[in-house]
Amino acid sequence: MWRSLGLALALCLLPYGGAESQGQSSACYKAPEWYIGDQNPMLNSEGKVTVVALLQASUYLCLLQASRLEDLRIKLESQGYFNISYIVVNHQGSPSQLKHSHLKKQVSEHIAVYRQEEDGIDVWTLLNGNKDDFLIYDRCGRLVYHLGLPYSFLTFPYVEEAIKIAYCEERCGNCNLTSLEDEDFCKTVTSATANKTAEPSEAHSHHKHHNKHGQEHLGSSKPSENQQPGPSETTLPPSGLHHHHRHRGQHRQGHLESUDTTASEGLHLSLAQRKLURRGCINQLLCKLSKESEAAPSSCCCHCRHLIFEKSGSAIAUQCAENLPSLCSUQGLFAEEKVTESCQCRSPPAAUQNQPMNPMEANPNUSUDNQTRKUKUHSN
């Protein structure tokens, strides 16, 4: 229960309710009209909470996201959240169009998967979205949340919580399309949440009284005024949630935003995240520049801006949340780490200079001195 309240608070702290747009906030505004062929998916979803996922069929992580979206749909329906429309919009690029069927196979017929026309208006651009973004609209089609990586990653609970908030809370004001059944359901949910909030408070009060009573009988001294209380059981959001959208595009070279040591102390980071936090470079990969690139044809470090690592057996999938100036095909230290993404390619000296790292994790073209915490690199 406290975890749920913590998530709701974290979502509230997102600027403009988690929504973002070019130039001004799009929170609580209706989505711009967009079509797939002659279909208007948003119009078809009127009267329902609508979840729009921007997924790329050529991306392994996106296929996992689609599969998890199906799992989330089933979970929410089992809890009584029925009146929700789920929409997946595939990327407009040719590689994604060729693998559209792979994306569609990840979900049931209850989730609509749309293929964009390559020569049509790009829906992602129209919605000001990026890969793996989730846009959540209320029943009147008003944008309640626009979540990007890493908070749109479905192993985290933020998308689920955002859907529930859009379903039962009038964040954008009253909507006359809410059914009586949904109103009754939300009243029940609100009442149950209020009861759960009261129960721990009473138990905590009784526990404090019991401890004080026991201390009096045992002759224990009172705790010092300077004594700090133990850590809260409230689940905290990952570092940077409340300012995630504000800092998009203001990436600090070589460091994952959520790895800020001062902000992330005490948070329950995954093993992969902790490993990333210890590295100077986010991810050292061998990169080959695309033939179209005007840059020198040398190896480079692939510094993705919003890295997400997904363990699947021994495989590690790395992906970038947004396009960066230069394209490169990245080959990891192991065969299964091969990634083709939009990455920022830099020449080896610029990429590796002043970066503390383990030589085993570094680019083979770089030699690193852990004492001086510097690396020297040479071109192929």
From Swiss-Prot:
Annotated localization: Secreted
InterPro entries in the record: Selenoprotein-P_N (IPR007671), SelP_C (IPR007672), SeP (IPR037941)
PTM section of the record: Phosphorylation sites are present in the extracellular medium.
Modified residues (Phosphoserine): S264
GO molecular-function term, one example from the UniProt record: selenium binding
GO cellular component terms listed in the entry, alphabetical order: extracellular region; extracellular space
One of the protein's GO biological processes: brain development
Compositionally skewed regions (Basic residues) per UniProt: 241-253
Biased composition (Low complexity): 348-360
Tissue expression remark: In the kidney, expressed in the cortex with no expression observed in the medulla (at protein level). Expressed by the liver and secreted in plasma.
Region entry Disordered, spans: 196-257, 346-380
Residues of this chain annotated as glycosylated in UniProt: N83, N176, N195, N365, N370
Bias type Polar residues, positions: 221-237
Signal peptide: 1-19
Pfam families in alphabetical order: SelP_C, SelP_N
Main location per the UniProt record: secreted
Keyword terms, alphabetized: Glycoprotein, Phosphoprotein, Secreted, Selenium, Selenocysteine, Signal
Similarity-based family: Belongs to the selenoprotein P family.
Protein function: Might be responsible for some of the extracellular antioxidant defense properties of selenium or might be involved in the transport of selenium. May supply selenium to tissues such as brain and testis.
Free-text note regarding domains: The C-terminus is not required for endocytic uptake in the proximal tubule epithelium.
Name assigned to this protein: Selenoprotein P
Organism name: Mus musculus (Mouse)
Gene this chain is encoded by: Selenop
